[in-house]
């Protein structure tokens, strides 16, 4: 774990700029030109991480509690919440350890600190890769539910989903170990960037195709009932707005981090790039914000999951409240959200 400050996190050796002393200011680069540098207070960073941690724990607990949510789609959502939980948790852990080291509260050998740094970096990198993979898996699952609706339950069986989940976790951990070990190779960073772009393109293509199918379906209903065309236009605009928000949040939260990695490869010594490198912690904060937003988009829009979540929260205050139901929530219509082209 580097000692230059909380900015050096995942692939920490990529960013050795000192932490800014002001929340928002203009720092001078080597030529004296102004350089915008935003500092994220450690308290804010830890608070956002805590919100993400609690939010995703609730999602995992709700899905684990309700047997009606033990479908392939909710398994992917649960794993997305778990990977987001690890993203926020690992970043919080590293920030807390750095603060303890800088304060002199935690004293240990340099070799132990470096080993701990490498372990946390692997955990952070693997959880980030898993988060991206499960976002793609959710898009694929919903695409199949729309275009292969009659065969959906025979294609996306629970054992197949479990094998896909296991493959994602194992591949992410192994890849992260290699990425952290060979972080100073340009090919490694380019692989990460290409992977992000592939996930972005995959999600965009699938969701746009699903939106087009939904618009065609709505148009068919309108023609069947001889309704006016403006209603169809309104549906298309709402769907396009939802899709724009979905992909826009994904790109805005993850894009800056992978832009940072791209610039490290192509212009590591350029003055403008160095100014961008100074905001590395901002990019990590955006990823933490994405882990907060993901449950709102993919989990909490499900009515049954919200009901189960309420039960989980009530039972945390009044133990034994679910004893009559055997500890499992049973709500009718649990598969309604499996058919929507966009997040439930």
From Swiss-Prot:
GO molecular function terms attached to this record: melanocyte-stimulating hormone receptor activity
Record keywords, A-Z: Cell membrane, G-protein coupled receptor, Glycoprotein, Lipoprotein, Membrane, Palmitate, Receptor, Transducer, Transmembrane, Transmembrane helix
Gene Ontology biological process: adenylate cyclase-activating G protein-coupled receptor signaling pathway
InterPro entries given in the database record: GPCR_Rhodpsn, GPCR_Rhodpsn_7TM, Melcrt_ACTH_rcpt, MSH_rcpt
Species classification: Eukaryota, Metazoa, Chordata, Craniata, Vertebrata
Name of the protein described by the UniProt record: Melanocyte-stimulating hormone receptor
Keyword Transmembrane on entry: yes
Stated role: Receptor for MSH (alpha, beta and gamma) and ACTH. The activity of this receptor is mediated by G proteins which activate adenylate cyclase. Mediates melanogenesis, the production of eumelanin (black/brown) and phaeomelanin (red/yellow), via regulation of cAMP signaling in melanocytes.
Organism: Mico argentatus (Silvery marmoset)
GO cellular component term of the entry, any: plasma membrane
Record membrane topology: Multi-pass membrane protein
